[in-house]
């Protein structure tokens, strides 16, 4: 008990935790990309669906990053295939998944500017209402560590509408989207914070033409 309460030990423990946090954050910035805070109070309509016609292709394996990018490229009038883009996708991990930094790099090669943001639901909805589909980084399933890139194309007061490339997650077949998620369920998926990436939650790419 005396050892635990020792000021030297407490200081050592504090510095160890602080050093670990700083080291983890630096590594995350290098691998994942630098986060830009994006928090707003409102300034968007109560419901919105991006009217631009697009198709939703289904991925075969771990290519959600490329399929999300392909969807966005088609939104900007450029024919794109998720399979083809995945072959040139940078920042792949050994298991085939892709760091967010890879999405930013690929879109930059295609002439699009992607800003990796962390923010609130208001910021996400405002971006959708601008007419440009953001790509969110979410959990594939609540409580699981598998992560997933997917474009968001609309919302109403209670739901978000996604252009889902994973067939198992598609739950509807509407004009422009194939997945409808309640705000409550979306927040569970959108919280991607883990011990290895504590600051990376509620993230999305804000994408625009250069």
Model-predicted regions and their roles:
Residues 9, 13-16, 20-95, 140, ...:
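Active-site-adjacent structural segments surrounding the nucleophilic cysteine of cysteine proteases
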Residues 93-122:
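Mid-chain, structured segments of secreted extracytoplasmic proteins
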Residues 93, 129, 133, 155-210:
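Noncatalytic regulatory segments and standalone regulatory/sensor domains
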Residues 113-171:
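Active-site-adjacent substructure of cysteine-protease-like catalytic cores
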Residues 65-73, 82-86, 100, 104, ...:
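Extracytoplasmic/secreted envelope proteins and their assembly/folding machinery
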